[in-house]
Amino acid sequence: MSLKQYSEEQLKEMALVEIAYEIFSEHKKPITFQELTDQVASLLGMGKEELEDRIAQFYTDLNIDGRFLALSDQTWGLRSWYPYDQLDEETQPTVKAKKKKAKKAVEEDLDLDEFEEIDEDDILLDDVEEDLDIDADEFDEIDEADDDELDDLEDEILDDDEDFDEEEDEE
């Protein structure tokens, strides 16, 4: 049924998605969402404010209704216009190919000849220990010095506590 066959009252009682379906059926080509809302508003005699109040629900209804298909760049059409195989081709975004110049520049930056290959068999544990120059006696001396400092600190704290207790007793 054509939109021209409906009275103004019948159009106002129809859901916006039903009107959109009729618009697509008449035009028989995809249109942008903006054009669709403009046509619906003009058919219903809607003001800008009323359209703004209902536009979110209208967009949601278009997405949910299985008869409509969102194409690229806010363009909508009827799902029945597109065979299933054609849908993937038209609705999927195109992937841009990477430039080969950038890849060549990266390869030039990485000059792998500068790095020396090291065989794990060539590395011996003895060599590593010699490089680190670990002397266990040095660590023992440091530990003893730390222990002496802690003992001195404990003695000072105990002396201070005793002095504090004596002062309290005198008062």
Swiss-Prot record:
Source organism superkingdom: Bacteria
Positions of the UniProt region annotated as Disordered: 138-171
Segments forming domain HTH HARE-type: 14-81
Name assigned to this protein: Probable DNA-directed RNA polymerase subunit delta
Coiled-coil zones: none
Family: Belongs to the RpoE family.
Function comment: Participates in both the initiation and recycling phases of transcription. In the presence of the delta subunit, RNAP displays an increased specificity of transcription, a decreased affinity for nucleic acids, and an increased efficiency of RNA synthesis because of enhanced recycling.
Pfam families in alphabetical order: HARE-HTH
A Gene Ontology cellular-component term: DNA-directed RNA polymerase complex
Subunit structure and binding partners: RNAP is composed of a core of 2 alpha, a beta and a beta' subunits. The core is associated with a delta subunit and one of several sigma factors.
Keywords: DNA-directed RNA polymerase, Nucleotidyltransferase, Transcription, Transferase
InterPro entries per the UniProt record, alphabetical: Asxl_HARE-HTH (IPR007759), RNAP_delta_N_dom_sf (IPR038087), RpoE (IPR029757)
GO biological process, one term: regulation of DNA-templated transcription
GO molecular function: DNA-directed RNA polymerase activity
HAMAP family, sorted: RNApol_bact_RpoE (MF_00357)
